[in-house]
């Protein structure tokens, strides 16, 4: 009888241990894999990336700005680079964006003013100088026509700032012809635009949404969010994602009546600084935690699809079926295997 009891006790102990280990074993059925295509050494930290066809513009931190050709994706070719001295700035470059229709490149000196670079004469990069206000955290560029563009800046001092430029054929220069400021609910540190909708992130004060109609921009509402609202990504005129650092991320609706109903918080346990969107794929930049992948499940939930330790990630973008990750280790290009 004693022998049977001992054997039964031993069996139960094994069963308990087996059950515990089966519970803590990760379920890999719904995880997505990252397949590396190429890793580009960018000298300085790769802080940001902008893709336009086969051209990849890189904000290379202390190394300035770089232009890479990815006509052959597995063998990128460096076309040119501009150091901080050549750009006429002192601090690292943290953002780049390119207006392909007018062939103008824009970069941001960290916590300073945006920088304008003319690329209309082929591969020659002609620095036009800086504009707008100091303490610009992020900006967007919209072209008005072939000879005009407007820069929308998240000015950490003054709110939403607009600067319009027009090209003068006689002088072969771009001139700042108009501009004004719109006070925001707090000090903005991020911006995104889709159609007539503009959203600013306001750090501890959440976000503020604006609407543009017939050249007049008005504030529509402000939403307080957990954490520090860092960056916003608009996916259409009705929805957008907000990276809120240690509070993870939120998906929100732009309609005033839909604010509470459309609010979804996810990645609560991660430090999120940016969100890239490609249909059903979300790529969250998580600083030292790498890159986290998520998938929206309809309109009510967002599911985790894996965290990938690829180094310190600042920013990510989707383009042409690839995921471009701007990291301290350089620019890394991946394909997602679902």
Language model features with spans:
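Bacterial Sec-dependent N-terminal signal peptides
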Residues: 19-46
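A short beta-strand motif characteristic of beta-propeller blades
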Residues: 35-41, 77-87, 123-131, 171-182, ...
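Beta-strand-rich domains and repeat architectures in extracellular enzymes and scaffolds
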Residues: 38-65
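Repeated scaffold domains used in trafficking and secretory/extracellular systems
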Residues: 44-50, 90-98, 133-143, 184-193, ...
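Short coil/turn segments that connect the beta-strands within blades of beta-propeller domains
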Residues: 53-54, 101-103, 147-149, 195-196, ...
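Loop/turn residues immediately N-terminal
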Residues: 62-65, 111-114, 157-160, 204-207, ...
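Short loop/turn segments that connect beta-strands within beta-propeller blades
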Residues: 70-74, 118-123, 165-169, 211-216, ...
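Blade-level signature of beta-propeller repeat domains, shared across WD40, Kelch, NHL, RCC1
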Residues: 310-338
């Amino acid at each position: 009888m004693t022998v049977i009891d001992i054997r039964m006790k031993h069996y139960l102990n094994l069963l308990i241990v087996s059950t515990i280990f089966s519970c803590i074993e990760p379920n890999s059925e719904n995880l997505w894999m990252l397949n590396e295509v190429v890793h580009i050494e960018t000298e300085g930290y790769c802080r940001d990336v902008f893709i336009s066809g086969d051209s990849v513009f890189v904000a290379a931190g202390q190394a300035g700005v770089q232009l890479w050709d990815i006509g052959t994706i597995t063998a990128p070719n460096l076309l040119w680079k501009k150091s901080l001295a050549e750009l006429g700035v002192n601090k690292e470059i943290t953002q780049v964006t390119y207006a392909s229709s007018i062939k103008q490149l824009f970069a941001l000196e960290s916590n300073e003013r945006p920088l304008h670079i003319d690329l209309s004469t082929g591969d020659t990069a002609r620095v036009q100088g800086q504009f707008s206000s100091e303490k610009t955290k992020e900006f967007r560029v919209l072209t008005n026509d072939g000879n005009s563009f407007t820069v929308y800046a998240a000015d950490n001092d003054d709110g939403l700032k607009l600067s319009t430029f027009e090209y003068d054929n006689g002088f072969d220069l771009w001139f700042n012809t108009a501009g004004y400021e719109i006070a925001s609910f707090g000090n903005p540190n991020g911006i995104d635009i889709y159609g007539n909708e503009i959203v600013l992130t306001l750090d501890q004060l959440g976000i503020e949404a604006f609407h543009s109609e017939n050249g007049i921009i008005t504030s529509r509402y402000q939403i307080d969010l957990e954490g520090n609202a860092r960056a916003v990504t608009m996916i259409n005129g009705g929805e957008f994602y907000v990276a809120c650092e240690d509070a993870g991320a939120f998906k929100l609706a732009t309609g005033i009546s839909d604010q509470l109903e459309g609010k979804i918080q996810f990645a609560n346990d991660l430090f999120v600084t940016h969100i890239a969107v490609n249909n059903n794929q979300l790529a969250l930049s998580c600083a030292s935690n790498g890159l986290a992948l998520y998938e929206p499940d309809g309109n009510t939930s967002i599911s985790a699809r894996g965290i990938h330790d690829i180094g310190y990630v600042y920013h990510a973008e989707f383009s042409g079926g690839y995921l471009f990750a701007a990291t301290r280790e350089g620019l890394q290009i991946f394909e997602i295997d679902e």
